[in-house]
């Protein structure tokens, strides 16, 4: 097993202007320890700052006009409809393709966009993995192509967390006064629950891989 390892965590829209006050209040001790024992800096972004475009630029080292991912949506196969962006239109290799080509191991979880999962030397769990698209009482079927290798789909499917599984203990740290929110009029708690469930699902898959797979 290679002792020299790199872990890249994508934190969409993270800004030191928001993070520094939280660290100063002692609310992000783990990140604060990483900052104090390492190096930090500000990244220049691209314009317009569209997440799939930026994430693909990071993964490929190319600008959008070269890598081909330009926004949140793309034209469907029929040429008439619009669908959430996938990696189908990416024109160049991502870092995980290059590592596979060189015989190195890599794992990818939830990178945007990474669907359909690519046959890399490792595990890839696409960004279509975490979002619950059905009510809790209906089957939560994983879309084909979400996991590589495909034989691990059932395993990772069992790690997913549905927003309806969250309890008050999960919501209270973010909205202490959540009990007084009129959810009939205000949908922000519902949106927050989806975000927490999505992030927790990605975290569950990522930490399982770190613990059980060579990297």
Locations of the language-model features?
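Glycine-/proline-rich flexible loop or hinge segments
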Residues: 13-17, 36-41, 50-54, 72-84
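Structural core of flavin- and non-heme-iron oxidoreductases
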Residues: 1-2, 103
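Glycine-centered flexibility sites
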Residues: 10-13, 26, 38, 61, ...
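Short, structured active-site-proximal loop/turn typified by the sulfatase FGly-forming signature C/S-X-P-X-R
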Residues: 19-57, 62, 105-107
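An acidic- and aromatic-residue-enriched active-site/binding cleft used to recognize and process polar
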Residues: 13-14, 24, 39, 45-48, ...
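Short phosphate-engaging motifs
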Residues: 15, 30, 50, 65, ...
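Beta-strand elements within well-structured catalytic alpha/beta cores of enzymes
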Residues: 3-20, 34, 58, 99, ...
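His/Asp/Glu-rich, glycine-adjacent segments
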Residues: 63-215
């Amino acid at each position: 097993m290679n002792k020299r390892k790199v872990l890249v965590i994508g934190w969409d829209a993270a800004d030191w202007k928001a993070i520094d006050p939280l660290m100063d209040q002692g609310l992000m001790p783990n990140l604060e320890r990483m900052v104090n024992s390492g190096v930090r800096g500000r990244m220049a972004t691209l314009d317009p700052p569209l997440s799939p475009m930026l994430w693909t630029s990071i993964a490929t080292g190319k600008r959008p006009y070269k890598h081909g991912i330009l926004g949140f949506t793309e034209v469907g196969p029929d040429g008439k409809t619009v669908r959430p962006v996938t990696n189908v239109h990416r024109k160049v290799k991502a870092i995980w393709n290059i590592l596979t080509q060189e015989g190195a191991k890599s794992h990818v979880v939830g990178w945007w966009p990474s669907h359909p999962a690519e046959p890399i030397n490792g595990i890839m769990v696409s960004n279509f993995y975490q979002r619950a698209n059905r009510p809790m009482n209906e089957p939560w079927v994983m879309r084909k192509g979400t996991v590589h290798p495909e034989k691990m789909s059932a395993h990772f499917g069992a790690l997913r967390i549905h927003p309806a599984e969250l309890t008050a203990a999960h919501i209270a740290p973010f909205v202490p006064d959540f009990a007084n929110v009129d959810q009939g009029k205000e949908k922000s708690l519902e949106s927050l629950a989806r975000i927490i469930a999505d992030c927790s699902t990605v975290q569950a898959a990522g930490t399982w891989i770190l613990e059980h797979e060579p990297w």
